[in-house]
Design a protein with these regions (language model features):
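Beta-propeller domains
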Residues: 68-98, 134, 148-149
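Beta-strand-rich domains and repeat architectures in extracellular enzymes and scaffolds
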Residues: 45-79
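Asp-box/WD-like beta-propeller blade repeats and closely related beta-sheet repeat scaffolds
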Residues: 133-188
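Short loop/turn segments immediately following beta-strands, especially the blade-tip
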Residues: 203-208, 274-285, 386-390
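Blade-loop segments of beta-propeller domains
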Residues: 87-132, 136, 155-163
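Loop/turn-rich, solvent-exposed surfaces of beta-rich toroidal or solenoidal domains
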Residues: 255-267, 273-276, 291-332, 338
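Beta-rich, blade/repeat-based domains predominating
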Residues: 51-63, 103-126, 163-185, 195, ...
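Conserved beta-strand positions in repeat-built beta-propeller and related beta-rich domains
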Residues: 66-75, 117, 125-128, 185-192, ...
Length: 394
């Protein structure tokens, strides 16, 4: 009996030893490059490579001119707005305009976050007057229109005090030149510290309304944690802690008929829409307006948005290195996906049927990586054929 137990124990030990030997004897090799992998979508073309300051915005005019902007966030920025000419970026409209006037914040360009061509021979420059995300300089946050025929400034609209808060960061804009005697512009406030909002301004008078102030649709999703390249994007929190980056209403697009405004907070995966008729009507209360906003569901986390003349809406998806397209029937499809699309930022549709967009590795900035700047130059302006025209503005 004793011998039987010993024999059984020896057999068990032998089997275990053999299994262990087989396990340790297995040979591991580096994963072959030929192993099944994520497949890119869309044929991307590089329009320009940036080896200096990081760009955020791009716009393509009705004649094909391309403008970009460089906010003053810490990089060396000799000019905050430029035009790509003959393969180089040059200050626009000139170097002098790109310098802050300390005596008059409403004069020179301080820190431009967005550039948008209005389809009627002008390019508009959106000046945050908030370098480094500081509080905007009093009287400095403004819209500047440049005539494309003369390359001269033809209009300055300083945002009135009733729409600019201490934490305001005007981010992006869209124009409807059919509404009002000279048109209407819609601007997102993507505040990092205060309430988000949509600013509605009459171009003729400069009169402005602050709408959806602090509404759920313009605010940071409190449960949202952005994950890019497999890593949570964190910023400074209270008492030296780190917390998910919180940026309010950012991307914006206007439907081809001007009746619907699409928008989304950067720190959210939802797309929202509201009727511009209600947005422009000061008699509609904030509660009524907030109740009229449509939540169109998840689209991925976006920085920039854009709309085409066929009724589609395009949205960057920075967590998945992608651009998505919402068809008029509400269905979504991915039109571009590539591991090199590190943070698709602003989108713009050119007259050539291409979707142009900036890729700038925004999430690799030092303030999101405990002081370590992980960006690798160049940043890129890319384009993708979509066979669609931009949504009309007039």
């Amino acid at each position: 009996m004793h011998r039987t137990k010993i024999s059984a124990a020896i057999a068990i030990i032998s089997v275990a030893t053999l299994a262990t030997s087989l396990a340790y004897g297995a040979t591991a090799i580096p994963l072959p490059a030929s192993a099944p992998a994520d497949k890119p979508i869309g044929k991307l073309e590089q329009v320009h490579a940036f080896y200096d300051a990081m760009p955020t915005g791009v716009t393509v005019t009705e004649t094909g001119r391309i403008f970009v902007n460089f906010p003053r966030w810490g990089d060396k920025v000799p000019f905050t707005v430029g035009e790509i000419r003959d393969g180089k970026v040059v200050a626009y409209p000139d170097l002098a305009v790109n310098k802050e006037n300390p005596k008059d914040p409403g004069d020179g360009l301080i820190s431009v976050q967005s550039v948008v061509a209005d389809g009627k021979g002008r390019v508009w420059l959106l000046d945050t007057a908030a370098p480094g995300f500081a509080s905007p300089r009093p009287g400095g946050a403004k819209l500047v229109a440049v005539d494309l025929a003369t390359n001269r400034i033809v209009k300055r609209l300083v945002f009135p005090d009733n729409v600019i808060l201490p934490g305001t960061y005007v981010n992006d804009m869209r124009f409807d030149l059919r509404k009002g005697s000279e048109g209407t512009v819609y601007v997102t406030d993507s505040s990092l510290s205060g309430p988000g909002a949509i600013i509605v301004m009459d171009i003729a008078s400069g009169h402005a309304l602050r709408r959806l102030n602090g509404a759920q649709s313009t605010s940071v999703d409190p449960a949202f944690v952005p994950v890019v390249e497999g890593v949570a994007v964190l910023g400074d929190g209270p008492n030296g802690t780190r917390k998910p980056v919180g940026v309010a209403s950012d991307g914006i697009a206007l439907s081809a008929d001007g009746k619907t405004l699409y928008f989304s907070p950067l720190s959210s995966r939802h797309l929202y829409a509201v009727a511009t008729e209600l947005l422009n009507d000061s008699k509609v209360s904030e509660q009524q307006l907030a109740a009229a906003v449509q939540d169109l569901g998840e689209k991925g986390a976006s920085d920039g948005l854009e709309a085409d003349a066929k009724g589609a809406v395009y949205a960057g998806d920075y967590e998945h290195n992608s651009i998505r397209k919402r068809l008029p029937d509400g269905t979504w499809q991915t039109v571009a996906h590539d591991p090199r699309m590190l943070w698709p930022d602003t989108l713009s549709i050119g007259p050539d049927g291409y979707l142009y967009f900036i890729v700038n590795q925004l999430h690799r900035q030092a303030n999101f990586n405990a002081g370590h700047d992980k960006r690798e130059k160049p940043y890129s302006l890319l384009r993708l054929k979509i066979d669609a025209a931009p949504a009309p503005t007039h």
